A protein has these predicted regions:
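Von Willebrand factor
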Residues: 1-16, 18-68, 71-72, 79-81, 102, 105-115, 119-121
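Residue-level recognition of the N-termini of beta-strands and the immediately preceding loop/turn
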Residues: 67-70, 97-98, 138-141
Length: 167
């Protein structure tokens, strides 16, 4: 499966049972965090990998696949390619791809009650994607957490799955 890190579309090797211990510090060491994130570029690459016939571009009719794709999209910032991101989300609504956006920081849809009380958000664009018009189906969800570590595995799983129905 493809892996993406910041604007690097190759990204780190997948995490598994054999390399989970110390995985995150090693990834950050090999792939330092950057100041630019292009959601649209990453979404296009994911679509090209899973549904190559569309070449990451527009689709005019629904596409079927043997298995749906669940994309967990984790970010701590906004994107520099908002228009491309919106196009990718609209086009991919014809494909069996579900996008779960998780903002790490402060958001209006924060699952931390203390943060939810704030009116401002680090993720207004992600919040708008969750309700983006012009899609065949609602195939995206968004939430924010101050830190994923503040939630148990079971609670985090519940946050990740409420709108996913297997496309």
């Amino acid at each position: 499966s493809p892996r993406f890190h910041s604007s690097n579309l190759k990204g780190p090797v997948p995490m598994g049972l054999s390399n989970w211990n110390g995985y995150i510090p090693q990834v950050i060491k090999l792939h330092p965090l950057e100041g630019d994130t292009r959601y649209g570029r990453a979404m296009e690459a994911i679509r090209q990998f899973y549904v190559p016939d569309a070449a990451g571009g527009a689709r005019t009719s629904p596409h079927k696949a043997a298995l749906p794709v669940y994309v967990m999209f984790v970010t701590d910032g906004s994107t520099s390619d908002k228009s491309a991101t919106e196009k990718q989300l609209r086009w991919s609504s014809m494909e069996p791809i579900f996008w779960q956006f998780m903002g790490v920081g402060k958001g209006r849809k924060s699952k931390n009650k203390l943060l939810a009380a704030f009116q401002d958000s680090d993720f207004p664009f992600l919040e708008s994607l969750d309700e983006l018009p012009g899609r065949l189906i609602d195939h995206a969800n968004y939430f924010a957490v101050h830190s994923p570590a503040e939630h148990s595995d079971a609670a985090l799983y519940e946050l990740l799955m409420p709108e996913y129905h297997g496309c």
